[in-house]
Regions:
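Substrate-binding/catalytic cleft of secreted carbohydrate-active enzymes
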Residues: 37, 42-74, 82-183
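A broadly conserved amphipathic alpha-helix scaffold signal in soluble, globular proteins
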Residues: 22-29, 80-84, 98
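Aromatic-lined substrate-binding rim segments of carbohydrate-active enzymes
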Residues: 1-48, 120-125
């Protein structure tokens, strides 16, 4: 889910037409598919500005991907709006959303556990009552992992996944969030 697709203007959310992510999730359920939701707020995915809305650039001296209070306020507004659309569609509510990701590859950027904890709490407070997870490369799990979220790895599957995940969550589950067969 890309934040900039749903909040093109500050405080104005669009979940209609092509932006109707709830309809997409329901369609997946009709087809017998489950959804692993990755709401960001930073999505990366080689998407413009990592999925952040461009209007954030007007905020002078605001630090992105941090516990900057202004940034967190905008993140919370977005996560709450997304929760109204999608939290009713979790598997615990009869839907098909299995898991929700907290941030994206944060360990390669910084190690601000307070920021990650704030996002984790926002996601829970928005009604997402399914397991949460983080995803990082093997060498960045320490910085990107947060209590209350399963650590997952990005990259190519190898035996190292067991050792790395066991360090933070003994016994798994073992999950490669992004598999790179070629780059």
């Amino acid at each position: 889910v890309f934040w900039n697709f749903h909040e093109r203007q500050p405080g104005e959310f669009d979940f209609s037409g092509q932006a109707d992510v709830a309809e997409f999730v329901r369609l997946a359920q009709e087809e017998g598919l489950y959804v692993i939701l990755r709401p960001g707020p930073y999505a990366c995915a080689e998407w413009d500005f990592g999925g952040y809305p461009s209007w954030l650039l007007k905020e002078k001296n605001m630090v992105y991907r941090s516990k900057d209070p202004r940034f967190l306020e905008y993140c919370e507004r977005y996560i709450k709006a997304l929760g109204k659309q999608l939290a009713p569609l979790t598997v615990n509510n009869g839907g098909n959303i299995l898991m929700v990701q907290v941030e994206n590859e944060y360990g390669s950027y910084a190690a601000d556990k307070e920021y990650l904890a704030a996002l984790r709490d926002m996601i829970k407070d928005a009604g997402f009552n399914v397991p949460l997870f983080t995803c990082d490369g093997g060498g960045q799990v320490e910085a990107g992992h947060i209590d209350g979220a399963l650590p997952t790895l990005n990259g190519v599957f190898s035996e190292d996944i067991f050792k790395i995940i066991d360090k933070y969550h003994p016994g798994g589950p073992y999950f490669v969030a992004e598999s790179y067969p070629a780059w």
